[in-house]
């Protein structure tokens, strides 16, 4: 393969000149070796003219210098795929980072850059994916083979929610899961690995990490590494795969970090001008085909709780369901802090979820909306000034709001309370009975952090 030399190092961006050799194609992988024998993988981003290319480093450039020899591998970064990846932990390059044995030679590797599936191969069936989380299943149900976004600011519970979904869905689903940790805390990845090992889910899960401490190149490409592994299970084995990504915002953030160094003019709020294109290329590959499905659940950080920020706003367009986490709810101790009025799903349709479910969900939202409108009056004049009808709306809305909370299995070590998994039918039944006024005489606190409606009745007896 052709060889070149490093002419410039600017943090994660490296310029390479190929004197007489053919220039490597954009997205091709290059390898540099330092004097101490360390290897650094680069990915070609731009052709600069003058036989030079500008590349993005996939690991730290410390210890490398100008003049170092660079080898063109003649292909994009390629990562291992197939059953050998299950139960293992990899980095962006598909190198193992767990303590198990190295992978055997000759394992199939696929390039991380691929085209999205053709239109005629896409599947359009709509089937509900039960999560066991009441607020999600009732008001913003997830679609099998769909794309789901968990939106929230810092510290409102995105990662805990995604871990609960892994716990509930991966165990119930029994199929294959891929987890991509993109620019998040290493500690959380470590905790997740051991939790999955303890529960046995790890045997059917491939994990890929490019965490906060890694250079932007790794954080920008690690989502594609995880996606490539998921695509193999979908296309070659016809599996229904779960793809968890935590956090998709860090993918955008990493692109923004290298964008200026690559010489691109910044766009709105300093983001890269190619933001929508990069997001589209990633999201269009996460889809269901006539061979199998990829259901993706993506945590999306919302900077300063501003949903109009270009990064979360660009992601919205690609999703089938959104679960919006609200800081005000977490401050009230309502967990999961999912906003029941802002969260959306295209599956909340009588044709998909059934007439009863749809009517109960709509009535719950109407009751909560009425309560939200009355809150200003309550704050200024107090409850006594409300009509009897409005007082009843407020009482039921508060019970609904508390009943939308529940304990999580993954938070048991913090709360000391066992987690609860609530089937959809039980969820619909519980809210229907609250709306009918069956539990108007029970204290509000009995509805807080419980699973089924029967638990509310038991809790209320203990409070007497």
Swiss-Prot record:
Per its record, the protein catalyses: ATP + H2O + 4 H(+)(in) = ADP + phosphate + 5 H(+)(out)
Q: Its principal location?
A: membrane
GO terms (molecular function) for this protein are: ATP binding; ATP hydrolysis activity; proton-transporting ATP synthase activity, rotational mechanism
User: Where is this gene product found?
Assistant: Cell membrane
Name of encoding gene: atpD
Which residues hold ATP?
152-159
Q: Which Pfam families match?
A: ATP-synt_ab, ATP-synt_ab_N, ATP-synt_VA_C
Subunit and interaction comment? F-type ATPases have 2 components, CF(1) - the catalytic core - and CF(0) - the membrane proton channel. CF(1) has five subunits: alpha(3), beta(3), gamma(1), delta(1), epsilon(1). CF(0) has three main subunits: a(1), b(2) and c(9-12). The alpha and beta chains form an alternating ring which encloses part of the gamma chain. CF(1) is attached to CF(0) by a central stalk formed by the gamma and epsilon chains, while a peripheral stalk is formed by the delta and b chains.
Protein name per UniProt: ATP synthase subunit beta
PANTHER family hit by this protein: ATP SYNTHASE (PTHR15184), ATP SYNTHASE SUBUNIT BETA, MITOCHONDRIAL (PTHR15184:SF71)
Keywords, comma-separated and alphabetical: ATP synthesis, ATP-binding, Cell membrane, CF(1), Hydrogen ion transport, Ion transport, Membrane, Nucleotide-binding, Translocase, Transport
Which EC class heads this enzyme's classification? Answer: translocase
Q: What is its EC number?
A: 7.1.2.2
> Which PROSITE patterns does its entry note?
ATPASE_ALPHA_BETA (PS00152)
What cellular component GO annotations does this protein have? plasma membrane; proton-transporting ATP synthase complex
Membrane topology term reads: Peripheral membrane protein
Q: What family is it from? A: Belongs to the ATPase alpha/beta chains family.
Protein purpose = Produces ATP from ADP in the presence of a proton gradient across the membrane. The catalytic sites are hosted primarily by the beta subunits.
């Amino acid at each position: 393969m052709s060889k070149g030399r490093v002419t410039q190092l600017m943090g994660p961006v490296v310029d390479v000149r190929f004197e007489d050799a053919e220039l490597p194609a954009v997205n091709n992988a290059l390898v540099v070796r330092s004097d101490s024998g360390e290897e650094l993988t680069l990915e070609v981003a731009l052709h600069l003219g003058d036989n030079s290319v500008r590349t993005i480093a996939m690991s730290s450039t410390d210890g490398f210098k100008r003049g170092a020899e660079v080898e063109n591998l003649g292909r994009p970064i390629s990562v291992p795929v197939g059953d050998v990846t299950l139960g293992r932990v990899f980095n962006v390059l598909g190198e193992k980072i767990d303590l198990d044995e190295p992978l055997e030679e000759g394992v199939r590797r696929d390039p991380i850059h691929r085209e999205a599936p053709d239109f005629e191969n896409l599947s359009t069936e709509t089937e509900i994916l039960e999560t066991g989380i009441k607020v999600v299943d009732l008001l913003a149900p997830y679609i099998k083979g769909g794309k789901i976004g968990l939106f929230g600011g810092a510290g409102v519970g995105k990662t805990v929610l995604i871990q609960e979904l892994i716990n509930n869905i991966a165990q119930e689903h029994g199929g294959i899961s891929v987890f991509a940790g993109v620019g998040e805390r290493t500690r959380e990845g470590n905790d997740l690995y051991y939790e999955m090992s303890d529960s046995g889910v790890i045997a059917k899960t491939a994990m890929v990490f490019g965490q906060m401490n890694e250079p932007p190149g790794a954080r920008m490409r690690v989502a594609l590494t995880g996606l490539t592994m998921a695509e193999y299970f979908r296309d070659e084995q016809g599996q229904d795969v779960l793809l968890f990504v935590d956090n998709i915002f860090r993918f955008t953030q990493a692109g923004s970090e290298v964008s200026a160094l690559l010489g691109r003019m910044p766009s709105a709020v300093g983001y890269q001008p190619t933001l929508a294109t990069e997001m589209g290329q990633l999201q269009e590959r996460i889809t269901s085909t006539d061979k199998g499905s990829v259901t993706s659940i993506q945590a999306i950080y919302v900077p300063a709780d501003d949903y109009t920020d270009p990064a979360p706003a660009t992601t919205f367009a690609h999703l089938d369901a959104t679960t919006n986490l609200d800081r005000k709810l977490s401050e009230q101790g309502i967990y999961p802090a999912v906003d029941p009025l802002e969260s959306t799903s295209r599956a909340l349709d009588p044709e998909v979820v059934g007439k009863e479910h749809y009517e109960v969900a709509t009535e719950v939202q109407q009751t909560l909306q009425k309560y939200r409108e009355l809150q200003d009056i309550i704050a200024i004049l107090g409850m006594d000034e409300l009509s009897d009808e409005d007082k009843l709306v407020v009482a039921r809305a508060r019970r609904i709001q508390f009943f939308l909370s529940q304990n999580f299995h993954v938070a048991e070590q913090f709360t000391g309370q066992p987690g609860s998994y609530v089937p959809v039918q039980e969820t619909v039944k519980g809210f229907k009975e609250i709306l009918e006024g069956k539990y108007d005489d029970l204290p509000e606190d009995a509805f807080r952090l419980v699973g089924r409606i029967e638990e509310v009745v038991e809790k209320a007896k203990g409070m007497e």
